């Protein structure tokens, strides 16, 4: 079936059709939503409905109607699918007149509660002070008004292109003649590959043509050999060359480069190299570079001349159609005209040949056969027939089919019966299939207009009613008893019998018997009562067929005209569905019908897979089994069945090896799976589509193909991202089948019918058609000619995205100020195009630089750009524990972003202590994800340095841009600036969340905000309770997903209204954005709409501040004016920083930031939001050698002495010097400063001259930064001060006797065990403060706390009454009184398995918040117990 050009019809149905949608297995998977029943209908209907709805969504129609011939179950299916796609569906009418309409949502329908903002006195004071000192200037005001004319685009373009020297590009090099290839152990293997036979033909065709398509089956050798053919030919003929070969996956680029280098007996980085996002191994000698599509694209952004020295570009695996490959081909096609010597080779296993021939203009195609053995194919009907698989539902359906057959027999007797010859026998209750009313199949609140019982309600009727109705219908038909109609109408009107009631023995309805007997007035009566003219009897006849068969011409005319009026204007999609029914035998058709009525095939039938697997293992030869599943949940579910739940397998685990393949899984399976198993052991591989092309397992003989894949797609109409389970393409199905014939003939079991296969897409939907295009639209402006609109350039793509999606993406870029009205990139836009993250995350990072809270935002942005580090637990029982882990990391801050940040920081601490793997398992985190995030931070920070946002020294250095990193309110302001327009508002009256386009939004179950802080069982109305618990009326979110018809938001944070007012909306507000109370009125709301005069009066006194079409605030006139001016100061500061990132900050700039921070902090406190500690801590020291893909951060030389320690992404040599310099005054936690707890002499005086410490081996402070060890400057030097802006650390010190503590208090010294020394020294260096809390073992008390004031030396004290203690260090005692343990019973330490703080070993570190709370307990001691020292 051909795909409509605009969009894939393969959008899933949440209960069927084209893919298991969000409802059964929403993002992250797991079970159907509560209250949703499976909807089981024929495949033909599912496919037709999907096509119709997709065409409607992307077309210009506002409304669409479906025919009344649909059954209630089919209507239910359409309701659920429509709702999951963000459409509004309604059923109207009764009986035969019941039809369904689908409408597009109108954003204007969204009602919302009033948006207000009440400022505290301190906030007003802070803004007034700023404005009085530095008023908004005319220049600032003018710059922030909407532009009225276009600037000199050519000048700006040239300047900005020069400015944006992006990282991650391929190096410039000149073509050279390759060296001769070396002989290797792989030579004989190379010569056995199918592609080897065509070497001369391939080289010749490439020489003669600019573009060549090569289609070769997986395993034919095209990826590794074709680039080598070109190198060898150039060596042989003395021709210089330089080749780029792109791969869609990073791992593939590395693996192929390493393999090719090995085949040529070279080291990687010589003739053969690779470059991916975080790593490169290339040199000036490199002539063949393997890279990702994204890397080549970024190279092209530097200008068309970047390919002037390249001779060949090979784009491999083109069939994957990721957005970068399609985009790349668009640009390369243009460049072929400019570079006459450039050759382009497209290579793939399943290329859409005709599409690319058309696109590149009749270029030659080379086909390379693989060497697989024959693979037998079995579709669903074949599997059901040969294995005899059945289940309870299938048996039930078959029983009901027998009942239907009996009805047909009785019907036939009716048709042939003579009048008066048939006497009705005893009527029995009918037991036909009970299909629930369409609205029972939906979740709460279908469209509620449906009150009539459906035609399937006979089971609900009492036996006497069934008997009476059967008797009446029999009399009408057999005796032509017209008077019986009076009783039928009476029962329909008074006893709630359906007008479409079916005779229990024949399935005939009143309309059918009236039509067959020619009772015209009764037919009209029944139609007016809502009878369904499309209802069919058990033999498939409708009322019209009865009338035709029995020659009732008047009735035929009546029914035909009525049917025509019903169907007028409705879409007839049946012609689009290639039913091809003649291919199916009656037996197969029945088997499929029974199966589809028993199981919703939009999910994956694990029962059927287990049945198949058992059959293979007990009746087939040896050979590995490869099972293709859509995602993580299905893989784990099936694995658990095999290993634990199914006794047929669980009792024989020694006979199987189960492997799991998934791109995100923490598993070494991907290497182990390639090895052959021991004799007598069968390998069972559970895999996603990663095993289609990326990983080849040679001993696979059996493939079980679920036919499903999980695809992330962006709905540009509703701005929602959906993770959908969808049907694979035919090309993928063929690839999967080919995996079975690698070593000998195999079998491929397909869990879908031939009909489904025939209606699959030929090829996968290009990513360009299903992903957000903002990033590509930015790139388009750098790749396309200056005056070329984005849409025009993207229209040149092999399959252009729908204009609507491009329009929406461009609009989003305008919304976030990356583009102006004329689609020209703004100053911000040029910087965003340079950053290797999505535009909104890039904006977040740039705002963080200006707000000086970079570090936490770097971590959060990279996490959002990559993926959630929290993994789904393997065991279902652990899912609750996983949620609690996530919640614990939020520290009560009402923020999922906080959980991401603190999880990363805690992982880094665990890593520095050497137990990161156990930490990840315990906290359900992905180690690999964390490591990638570190690499992404490195790259992002490198780009910020290159652009001048982070300087090497002085103002704007790494310390300066982290001045406010410890202030969570400021960090959230940067989040808000980046997340806009992803906002929701709390409607307190109705306890619902509303968005710009959504009346009702819910928290995704994975969000910590979805679970209010209840210690016992959560309340039944969880969402309402969660909303009620929110401290503010505003939330930001990262992603909106749709599970069924409800929009869910995930990764949310509660924020204050003032943050929204200052950081959301466009920088350039219209001059009338602020309306004073006198001129303000609410459009469209009559004056009498208010409930009381008082309310009218109150509202009338408020000013209105309109930030965009949705954000309309009503607030006091003074507050509105102050906030508008604060906005203007912020946006003009941000604009100045974008124009000149390296320029020193002015007095105005500094004052503006100080005022903003004061406002944010005050309002945060006023809202009751907590300020967790430790969020600004810099990344801990970490050896880059331990990280994957890290060589781009490593020095090519070996590491030198500690004085030359290599610093991380975050520390330049210059900064290292700064770190040794005297520290500014340290800032203790405000609470202690106010209470006078801390030593009054604490400051710089006692430390400013202390400049170095003893040299430490570099291995103790491995790379990326944060805590270098400066070299020693001589013996006996004092310790320098700890680093400012670093977190406070807390440790428990256990003493074996009280005497040691008395000595410590007298002399101000302490010693600990050698095992604790390194940990404390490191903490002393990394932190602004280290507190030690003392407890004598067995005393039941804490005996006070001190702060550490020097590093631990080598000198030992003879005073201690304990053996085994190490060197002495200085401490300053702050509190010396005893605190009973019962005071601290409520404090649990997350860093010690959530044990109570008193249950700590010597040297146990406390989580910062817990430590802070513990120290505060001394303030609560009764007065008589206090004994504070100076």
From Swiss-Prot:
Residues 1288-1418 form the YTH domain. RNA binds at residues 1294-1296, 1310, 1360. Residues 1-37, 1164-1288 are annotated as: Disordered. It holds the Pfam family OB_NTP_bind. Residues 1164-1174 have a biased composition (Polar residues). Residues 14-33 have a biased composition (Gly residues). Residues 1191-1200, 1250-1264 have a biased composition (Low complexity). Keywords: ANK repeat, ATP-binding, Cytoplasm, Differentiation, Helicase, Hydrolase, Meiosis, Nucleotide-binding, Oogenesis, Phosphoprotein, Repeat, RNA-binding, Spermatogenesis. GO terms for biological process: germline cell cycle switching, mitotic to meiotic cell cycle; meiotic cell cycle; oocyte development; spermatid development. GO terms for molecular function: 3'-5' RNA helicase activity; ATP binding; ATP hydrolysis activity; N6-methyladenosine-containing RNA reader activity; RNA binding. Residues 203-369 form the Helicase ATP-binding domain. Residues 612-784 form the Helicase C-terminal domain. The modification Phosphoserine is found at residues 1089-1090, 1092, 1202, 1263, 1267, 1281. Its EC number is 3.6.4.13. GO terms for cellular component: cytoplasm; perinuclear region of cytoplasm; ribonucleoprotein granule. It is found in: Cytoplasm; Cytoplasm, Perinuclear region. It comes from the Eukaryota. Residues 1231-1249 have a biased composition (Basic and acidic residues). Interacts with MEIOC; binds transcripts that regulate the mitotic cell cycle inhibiting progression into metaphase, thereby allowing meiotic prophase to proceed normally. Interacts (via ANK repeats) with XRN1. Interacts with ZCCHC4. Associates with the small ribosomal subunit. Interacts with RBM46. 3'-5' RNA helicase that plays a key role in the male and female germline by promoting transition from mitotic to meiotic divisions in stem cells. Specifically recognizes and binds N6-methyladenosine (m6A)-containing RNAs, a modification present at internal sites of mRNAs and some non-coding RNAs that plays a role in the efficiency of RNA processing and stability. Essential for ensuring a successful progression of the meiotic program in the germline by regulating the level of m6A-containing RNAs. The YTH domain mediates RNA-binding. It recognizes and binds N6-methyladenosine (m6A)-containing RNAs. This is 3'-5' RNA helicase YTHDC2.
């Amino acid at each position: 079936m051909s795909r409509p050009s605009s969009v894939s019809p393969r959008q899933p149905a949440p209960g069927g059709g084209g893919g298991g949608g969000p409802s059964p297995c929403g993002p992250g998977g797991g079970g159907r939503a509560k209250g949703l029943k499976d909807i089981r209908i024929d495949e033909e209907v599912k496919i037709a409905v999907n096509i119709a709805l997709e065409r409607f969504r992307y077309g210009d129609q506002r409304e669409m109607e479906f025919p009344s011939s649909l059954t209630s179950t089919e209507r239910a299916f359409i309701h659920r699918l429509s709702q999951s796609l963000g459409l509004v569906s309604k059923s109207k009418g009764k009986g035969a007149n019941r039809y369904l309409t689908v409408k597009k949502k109108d954003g204007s329908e969204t009602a919302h509660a009033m948006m207000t903002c009440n400022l505290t006195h301190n906030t007003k004071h802070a803004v007034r002070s700023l404005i009085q000192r530095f008023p908004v200037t005319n220049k600032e005001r003018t710059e922030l008004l909407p532009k009225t004319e276009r600037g000199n685009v050519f000048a700006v373009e040239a300047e900005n292109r020069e400015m944006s020297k992006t990282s991650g590009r391929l190096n410039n090099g000149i073509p050279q003649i390759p060296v001769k290839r070396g002989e290797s152990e792989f030579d004989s293997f190379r010569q056995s590959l199918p592609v080897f036979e065509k070497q001369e033909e391939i080289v010749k065709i490439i020489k003669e043509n600019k573009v060549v398509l090569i289609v070769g089956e997986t395993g034919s050798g095209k990826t590794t050999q074709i680039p080598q053919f070109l190198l060898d030919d150039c060596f042989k003929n003395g021709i210089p060359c330089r080749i780029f070969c792109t791969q869609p996956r990073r791992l593939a680029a590395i693996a192929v480069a390493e393999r090719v280098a090995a085949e040529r007996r070279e080291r990687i980085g010589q003739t053969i190299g690779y470059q991916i996002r975080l790593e490169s191994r290339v040199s000036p000698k490199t002539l063949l570079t393997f890279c990702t599509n994204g890397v080549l694209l970024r190279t092209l952004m530097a200008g068309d001349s970047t390919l002037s020295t390249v001779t060949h570009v090979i784009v491999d695996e083109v069939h994957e159609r990721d957005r970068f490959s399609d985009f790349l081909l668009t640009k390369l096609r243009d460049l072929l005209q400019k570079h006459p010597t450039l050759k382009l080779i497209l290579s793939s296993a399943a290329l859409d040949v005709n599409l690319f021939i058309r696109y590149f203009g009749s270029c030659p195609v080379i086909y390379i056969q693989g060497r697989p053995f024959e693979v037998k194919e079995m579709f669903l009907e074949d599997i059901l027939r040969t294995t005899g698989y059945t289940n309870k539902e299938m048996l039930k359906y078959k029983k009901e089919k027998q009942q239907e057959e009996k009805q047909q027999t009785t019907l036939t007797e009716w048709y042939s019966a003579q009048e008066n010859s048939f006497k009705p026998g005893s009527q029995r209750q009918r037991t036909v299939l009970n299909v629930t009313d369409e609205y029972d199949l939906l979740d709460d609140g279908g469209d509620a207009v449906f009150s009539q019982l459906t035609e399937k309600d006979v089971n609900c009727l009492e036996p006497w009613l069934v008997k009476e109705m059967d008797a009446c219908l029999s009399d009408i038909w057999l005796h032509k008893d017209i008077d019986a109609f009076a009783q039928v109408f009476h029962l329909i009107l008074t006893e709630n019998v359906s007008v479409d009631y079916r005779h229990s023995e024949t399935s005939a309805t009143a309309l059918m018997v009236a039509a067959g007997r020619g009772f015209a007035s009764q037919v009209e009566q029944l139609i007016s009562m809502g009878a369904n003219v499309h209802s069919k009897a058990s033999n498939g006849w409708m009322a019209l067929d009865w009338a035709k068969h029995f020659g009732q011409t008047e009735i035929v005319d009546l029914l035909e005209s009525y049917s025509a009026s019903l169907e007028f204007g409705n879409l007839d999609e049946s012609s689009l569905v290639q039913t091809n029914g003649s291919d199916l035998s009656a037996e197969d058709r029945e088997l499929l019908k029974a199966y589809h009525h028993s199981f919703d095939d939009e999910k994956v039938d694990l029962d059927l897979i287990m049945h198949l697997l058992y059959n293979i293992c007990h009746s087939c030869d040896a050979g590995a089994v490869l099972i293709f599943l859509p995602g993580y949940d299905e893989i784990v579910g099936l694995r658990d069945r095999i290993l634990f739940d199914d006794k047929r397998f669980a009792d024989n685990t020694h006979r199987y090896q189960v492997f799991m393949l998934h791109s995100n899984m923490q598993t070494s399976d991907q290497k182990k799976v390639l090895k052959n198993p021991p004799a007598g052991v069968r390998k069972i591989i559970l895999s996603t589509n990663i095993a289609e092309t990326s990983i080849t397992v040679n001993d696979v003989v059996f493939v079980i193909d679920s036919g499903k894949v999980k695809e992330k797609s962006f709905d540009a109409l509703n701005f929602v991202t959906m993770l959908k389970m969808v049907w694979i393409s035919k090309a993928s199905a063929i690839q999967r089948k080919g995996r079975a014939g690698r070593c000998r003939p195999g079998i491929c079991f397909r869990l879908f019918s031939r009909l489904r296969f025939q209606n699959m897409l030929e090829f996968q939907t290009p990513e360009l058609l299903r992903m957000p295009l903002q990033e590509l639209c930015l790139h388009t402006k750098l790749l396309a000619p200056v005056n070329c609109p984005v849409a025009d350039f993207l229209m040149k793509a092999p399959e252009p995205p729908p204009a609507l999606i491009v329009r929406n993406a461009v609009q989003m870029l305008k919304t976030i100020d990356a583009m102006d009205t004329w689609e020209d990139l703004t100053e911000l836009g040029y910087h965003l195009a340079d950053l290797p993250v999505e535009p909104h995350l890039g904006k977040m990072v740039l705002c963080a630089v200006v707000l000086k809270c970079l570090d936490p935002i770097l971590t959060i942005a990279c996490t959002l750009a990559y993926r959630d580090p929290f993994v789904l637990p393997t065991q279902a029982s652990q899912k609750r524990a996983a949620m609690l882990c996530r919640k614990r990391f939020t520290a009560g801050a009402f923020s999922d972003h906080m959980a991401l940040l603190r999880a990363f920081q805690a992982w880094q601490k665990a890593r520095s202590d050497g137990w990161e793997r156990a930490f990840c398992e315990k906290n359900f985190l992905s180690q690999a994800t964390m490591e990638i995030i570190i690499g992404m931070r490195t790259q992002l920070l490198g780009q910020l340095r290159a652009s001048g946002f982070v300087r090497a020294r002085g103002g704007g250095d790494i310390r300066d841009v982290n001045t406010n990193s410890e202030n969570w309110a400021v960090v959230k302001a940067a989040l808000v600036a980046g997340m806009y327009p992803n906002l929701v508002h709390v409607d307190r009256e109705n306890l619902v969340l509303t968005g710009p386009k959504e009346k009702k939004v819910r928290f995704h179950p994975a969000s910590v905000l979805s679970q209010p802080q209840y210690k016992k069982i959560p309340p039944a109305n969880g969402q309402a309770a969660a909303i009620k618990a929110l401290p503010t009326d505003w939330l930001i979110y990262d992603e909106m997903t749709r599970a069924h018809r409800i929009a869910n938001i995930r990764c949310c944070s509660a924020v204050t209204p003032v943050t929204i007012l200052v950081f959301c909306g466009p920088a350039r507000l219209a001059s009338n954005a602020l309306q004073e109370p006198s001129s303000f009125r609410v459009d469209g709301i009559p004056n009498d709409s208010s409930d009381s005069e008082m309310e009218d009066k109150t509202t009338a006194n408020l000013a209105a501040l309109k930030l965009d079409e949705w954000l309309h605030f009503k607030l006091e006139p003074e507050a509105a004016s102050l906030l508008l001016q604060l906005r203007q100061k912020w946006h003009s500061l941000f604009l100045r920083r974008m124009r000149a990132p390296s320029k020193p900050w002015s007095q105005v700039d500094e004052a503006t930031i100080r005022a903003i921070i004061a406002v944010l902090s005050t309002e945060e406190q006023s809202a009751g939001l907590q300020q967790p500690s430790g969020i600004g801590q810099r990344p801990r020291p970490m050896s880059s050698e331990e990280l994957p893909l890290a060589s781009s951060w490593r020095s090519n030389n070996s590491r030198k002495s500690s004085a030359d320690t290599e610093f991380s992404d975050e520390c330049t040599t210059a900064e290292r010097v700064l770190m040794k310099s005297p520290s500014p005054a340290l800032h203790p936690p405000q609470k202690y400063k106010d209470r006078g707890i801390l030593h009054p002499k604490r400051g710089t005086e006692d430390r400013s001259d202390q400049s170095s410490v003893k040299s430490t081996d570099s291995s103790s402070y491995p790379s990326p930064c944060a805590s270098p060890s400066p070299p020693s400057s001589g013996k006996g030097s004092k310790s320098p001060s700890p680093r400012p802006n670093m977190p406070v650390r807390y440790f428990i010190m256990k003493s074996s006797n009280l005497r040691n503590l008395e000595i410590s208090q007298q002399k101000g010294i302490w010693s600990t065990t050698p095992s604790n020394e390194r940990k404390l020294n490191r903490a002393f260096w990394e932190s602004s403060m280290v507190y030690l809390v003392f407890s004598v073992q067995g005393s039941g008390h804490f005996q006070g706390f001190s702060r550490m004031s020097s590093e631990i030396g080598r000198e030992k004290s003879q005073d201690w009454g304990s053996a085994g203690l190490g060197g002495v260090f200085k401490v300053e005692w702050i509190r010396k009184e005893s605190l009973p343990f019962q005071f601290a019973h409520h404090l649990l330490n997350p860093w010690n398995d959530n044990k109570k703080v008193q249950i700590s070993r010597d040297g146990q570190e406390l989580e910062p918040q817990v430590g802070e709370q513990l120290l505060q307990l001394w303030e609560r001691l009764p007065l008589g117990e206090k004994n504070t020292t100076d």
